[in-house]
Amino acid sequence: MSAPHDPPRPEPRPDLRSLPLDRLERLVAALGERPFRARQLHRWLQQKGAASLDELTDVPRALRAALAEATTLTTLERATEQRSVDGTIKWTWRTHDGKLVESVYMPEPDRRTLCVSSQVGCAVGCTFCLTGTMGLARNLTPGEIVEQVHRANRRIVELGEGQGPRPLTNLVFMGMGEPLANYRSLKVALDLLLSEDGPNFSHRHVTVSTSGLVPMIRKLGEETPVKLAISLNATTDAQRDALMPINRRYPLAQLLEACRSFPIRNGRRITFEYVLLGGVNDSLEDAVRLARLVRGIPTKVNLIPYNANPGLPYRAPAPERVVEFQETLAARNLTAVVRKNRGGDISAACGQLAAEGGPGDPRRPAPPPLTRLPAAG
């Protein structure tokens, strides 16, 4: 007698906010509607950031009812909002399945930037990053990525800090997660965010940061026009192996070769992010090696003094060492900028995002003891 079979699971309903225009066109055709309805939906969802189907006031009620049956619509619930003394705002968003992710808004006189998350947690495991202590819960969908932008835009207007449907000017994919490890969702989200019928961000104002997934760096360069940032943080393989386990798979030589072949458009440069860890990677010898490593690559270096995280065994560099490091790079004709510490008082600075598994979360394991890094070669 054969064992009973479980009934087949129904296909999950597509998420409207994750659908590019061509998918919307196929959807409305399947529902018996004319093609112009797809562009109408696209504008509501991606340009105006509609939070519910009820907001689609010029879409027939019958079509809205059919969409409600055939699809879902990604929404993020704002779980917390924290404002720093410097004006930075950190939002924690709750997803439909109860996961928590964070976005950080950084206003400046000439721009309004949102730091966007791409995953719930992160599997890369950089030893100086609090997000890395969480592990990876799951990837975010394209809709969950772009919804961070829509929700931020709406909230900025509510707070009186911007006007129009899109007060944000810049996006940086430097939040929770490794964006290139969720490339499929990232690519769809980028297409939606750059769309003329959507938020219409300029590719010059969108930056994707990676810890060094070499094959996906090449893919990003081939398939999108956005800017690239590399989280480098070390000048030898021995150093980087200890700080960033991904280096054991894609060592510095491979990473830098991918950077050299990355298409540079309109005189733009690759940004190399370098977190300065006191007594670990902040020697002047490191600065000299860094200049040598990036030689021949159109480069901007962002120096990031380490932001202290309780439970992680690192310390910030001495202020005078930061200046000396920067001057050593400048003497070798490198543009090096010391990034301002934004939102440190609300744990919104670089390496501090951990909506789940943070220092106060009893589920978070104790960090391993720090061992001395191998001597730089």
UniProtKB/Swiss-Prot annotation:
<keyword id="KW-0819">tRNA processing</keyword>
<feature type="active site" description="Proton acceptor">
    <location>
        <position position="102"/>
    </location>
</feature>
<feature type="binding site">
    <location>
        <begin position="177"/>
        <end position="178"/>
    </location>
    <ligand>
        <name>S-adenosyl-L-methionine</name>
    </ligand>
</feature>
<feature type="binding site">
    <location>
        <position position="122"/>
    </location>
    <ligand>
        <name>[4Fe-4S] cluster</name>
    </ligand>
</feature>
<dbReference type="GO" id="GO:0030488">
    <property type="term" value="P:tRNA methylation"/>
</dbReference>
<dbReference type="GO" id="GO:0002935">
    <property type="term" value="F:tRNA (adenine(37)-C2)-methyltransferase activity"/>
</dbReference>
<comment type="similarity">
    <text>Belongs to the radical SAM superfamily. RlmN family.</text>
</comment>
<dbReference type="Pfam" id="PF21016">
    <property type="entry name" value="RlmN_N"/>
</dbReference>
<keyword id="KW-0489">Methyltransferase</keyword>
<keyword id="KW-0408">Iron</keyword>
<dbReference type="InterPro" id="IPR048641">
    <property type="entry name" value="RlmN_N"/>
</dbReference>
<keyword id="KW-0949">S-adenosyl-L-methionine</keyword>
<dbReference type="GO" id="GO:0005737">
    <property type="term" value="C:cytoplasm"/>
</dbReference>
<protein>
    <recommendedName>
        <fullName>Dual-specificity RNA methyltransferase RlmN</fullName>
        <ecNumber>2.1.1.192</ecNumber>
    </recommendedName>
</protein>
<feature type="binding site">
    <location>
        <position position="307"/>
    </location>
    <ligand>
        <name>S-adenosyl-L-methionine</name>
    </ligand>
</feature>
<keyword id="KW-0963">Cytoplasm</keyword>
<feature type="domain" description="Radical SAM core">
    <location>
        <begin position="108"/>
        <end position="345"/>
    </location>
</feature>
<dbReference type="GO" id="GO:0051539">
    <property type="term" value="F:4 iron, 4 sulfur cluster binding"/>
</dbReference>
<feature type="binding site">
    <location>
        <position position="126"/>
    </location>
    <ligand>
        <name>[4Fe-4S] cluster</name>
    </ligand>
</feature>
<dbReference type="InterPro" id="IPR027492">
    <property type="entry name" value="RNA_MTrfase_RlmN"/>
</dbReference>
<keyword id="KW-0479">Metal-binding</keyword>
<dbReference type="GO" id="GO:0070475">
    <property type="term" value="P:rRNA base methylation"/>
</dbReference>
<dbReference type="Pfam" id="PF04055">
    <property type="entry name" value="Radical_SAM"/>
</dbReference>
<keyword id="KW-1015">Disulfide bond</keyword>
<comment type="function">
    <text>Specifically methylates position 2 of adenine 2503 in 23S rRNA and position 2 of adenine 37 in tRNAs. m2A2503 modification seems to play a crucial role in the proofreading step occurring at the peptidyl transferase center and thus would serve to optimize ribosomal fidelity.</text>
</comment>
<dbReference type="InterPro" id="IPR040072">
    <property type="entry name" value="Methyltransferase_A"/>
</dbReference>
<dbReference type="InterPro" id="IPR004383">
    <property type="entry name" value="rRNA_lsu_MTrfase_RlmN/Cfr"/>
</dbReference>
<keyword id="KW-0411">Iron-sulfur</keyword>
<feature type="region of interest" description="Disordered">
    <location>
        <begin position="354"/>
        <end position="377"/>
    </location>
</feature>
<keyword id="KW-0808">Transferase</keyword>
<dbReference type="GO" id="GO:0070040">
    <property type="term" value="F:rRNA (adenine(2503)-C2-)-methyltransferase activity"/>
</dbReference>
<keyword id="KW-0004">4Fe-4S</keyword>
<feature type="binding site">
    <location>
        <position position="129"/>
    </location>
    <ligand>
        <name>[4Fe-4S] cluster</name>
    </ligand>
</feature>
<dbReference type="GO" id="GO:0000049">
    <property type="term" value="F:tRNA binding"/>
</dbReference>
<dbReference type="InterPro" id="IPR013785">
    <property type="entry name" value="Aldolase_TIM"/>
</dbReference>
<feature type="disulfide bond" description="(transient)">
    <location>
        <begin position="115"/>
        <end position="350"/>
    </location>
</feature>
<dbReference type="InterPro" id="IPR007197">
    <property type="entry name" value="rSAM"/>
</dbReference>
<feature type="binding site">
    <location>
        <begin position="231"/>
        <end position="233"/>
    </location>
    <ligand>
        <name>S-adenosyl-L-methionine</name>
    </ligand>
</feature>
<dbReference type="GO" id="GO:0019843">
    <property type="term" value="F:rRNA binding"/>
</dbReference>
<dbReference type="GO" id="GO:0046872">
    <property type="term" value="F:metal ion binding"/>
</dbReference>
<feature type="active site" description="S-methylcysteine intermediate">
    <location>
        <position position="350"/>
    </location>
</feature>
<keyword id="KW-0698">rRNA processing</keyword>
